[in-house]
Amino acid sequence: VIKLMKYLKRSAGYIVLIIALLFLQAYCDLSLPNYTSNIINVGIQQNGIEDSVPEKIRKTSMDGLKLFMEEDDAKTVDGFYEEEGDDLVLKDKISKEDREELNDIFGKPMVIVSTLTSDSEESKAALAKMGIPEGTDPLAALSQMPAEALAAMKDQVVEKIDKMQESIITQAGVSYVRAEYEAMGEDVDAIQMDYMKATGIRMVLMALVTMMAAVCVVFLSSRVAASMGHDLRGLVYNKVIGFSSREYHKFSTASLITRCTNDIQQIQQVMAMMFRIVLYAPILGIGGVIRVLQRDSSMTWILGVAIVLIMAFMAMLFRIAMPKFTALQTMVDKLNLVTREILTGIPVIRAFSREKHEEERFEDANITLTKTNLFVNRCMTFMMPVMMLIMNAVSVLTIYSGSYAVDSGSMQVGDVMAFIQYAMQIIMSFLMITAMSIMLPRANVSARRINEVLETEVSVQDPEDPVQPSQDVKGTVEFDHVSFAYPEAGENVITDISFKAEKGETVAIIGSTGSGKSTLINLIPRFYDATEGSVKVDGVDVRKMTQKDVRDRIGYVPQKGILFSGTIDSNIRYGKTEISEDAVKKAARVAQATEFIDTKPERYKTPIAQGGSNVSGGQKQRLSIARAIAKDPEIFIFDDSFSALDFKTDSTLRKALKEHTKEATTIIVAQRISTILNADKILVLDDGHMAGIGSHKELMKSCEVYRQIAMSQLSEEELA
């Protein structure tokens, strides 16, 4: 998959935006547990009072607190409050740092004052020890004490307070502030409700931002993935279109179809999921760990154990399942291949009553794929239950450990709740990556297969400086000591072939099956390049011309008629779309196709099904010939194109064709002698070698191979 990342360059801007949105989404997601904790800790337990800094306090109460403050701290406090009648009010604009400083200053004095003014036995004992009678205002009595005695007493109390948990000091300070507000007649319930509303609104806003960010990420990632899929399909298509026959033989047609469709679809899906999950999961997981460490580290061991267990389980799971993932796409190829062969070969299968055999072939490929899929899915079914077990175990351990922490005063209930939520988010991030890991191996295989196509070197390529043939020479084809061997084959298919076809000549090629006839003519349009010698068109080696330039001069009719979905008209115009309607009709007339076209209600607008499945073999072949004629090329190549025609149609077509192509060069590969009797030259091939060349009469005298072929097909009277 990494190798295909270079095809995302066009979407770099979108990717940067997606990453920014993912960070925003993660920030909002990770803020929600903190707000939940604040609602429990501050909103419920502290009545909406956030810290030990009173917004409003009586002067007498402040004087009592100052008894237990350092002189510098008392001056600092005075700087932040202003008088309002008998009360002191906190100034409006105060920074977060200043508030934290005030919170630290007020904390311990508030604990001391709360203890001394309470009705507890502990308070009474402390007052008696200091010699303050019961019923006396302790703060008034303490204010009358000598400074040295008060300082000594304060040091003893502070020493004890220093041993207390920070959370206990904070809670004592909050309790003091709440009691002060109540004493002043403030509506504490309103303060609590205002805090709950404000925090709730912030939570809703965070949730809305999270939702909007997630929607934008889904939209943008889908767009990027679709764009990449579009580009890959275009690249693979253009690459495959540029393949020579050598590369087509390397990849089966079924495999190329799978790579262009299913494999690219796999990558597109994974890319869309990758931005939404693979990138988001680590951001969320790492962010969750940071938030946990910032709040409290006493229970992080629970997360550590959970993460180790998850990673160990995933490593074991993929060690078992990964080889099967790799094999899946190959098995899909095999099933596609078998299915394609069966569907295209149904007439032959029925004719030979081989339905049972083909059913077994299909069943074998299908069962193999199904078993592998089942094995992979069974492995993956363990994933979710194990993850849920770990998640639930983390929750139980957190509650168990957290209850002790709450009891000892080192944590608050809201902190435990936040830890559970952060733990779930961290584990969910692993769960998301795990869910993606089901698709990643198959996508990785698909990416390798697509990359294999894209990185395949095309054996037939255009030259850097192509040569244009002279306008004076048109329609000549020359083979100069040409030999050819298929890649990785030990022997030549054709060896040392030399001949020349001039403009207006008809050159026929004949020979036994497998003698190299089709291979020979495939060298002209550069479906292959000769391994030795040269093939020249219009006096120029075809390897020095662009493939388009060579093929624009050729009208090629393959051995098997091939039509495309559309209409009769669109198929005839395929090689030259801009020709007139009269030219289309003329091409059909020369190809003897009008006799069946005129019988159809829609005539030239008659639909042609995929592969021409709604016309007969002879009709398909005549339309293929009409297509080549309509192109009006310099050179016609007929690769045994008349074999599907009856003798009468064959004879009529050849007469019309000879008249139409008298200014062009015609090369015909034939099996039937009757098709080529009147050819200007006949090239005889025998096991890849040139056994003879000449006219029919010359070869009957000089070439034994030709004579045997001729005598096996026609009588002596017909050959005379």
Enumerate the predicted regions with their spans.
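Membrane-integrated ABC transporters
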Residues: 1-204, 209, 213, 217-221, ...
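Transmembrane helices of ABC transporter permease
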Residues: 17-24, 273-328, 397-411
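Helix-loop-helix
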Residues: 291-308, 312, 375-449, 453-454
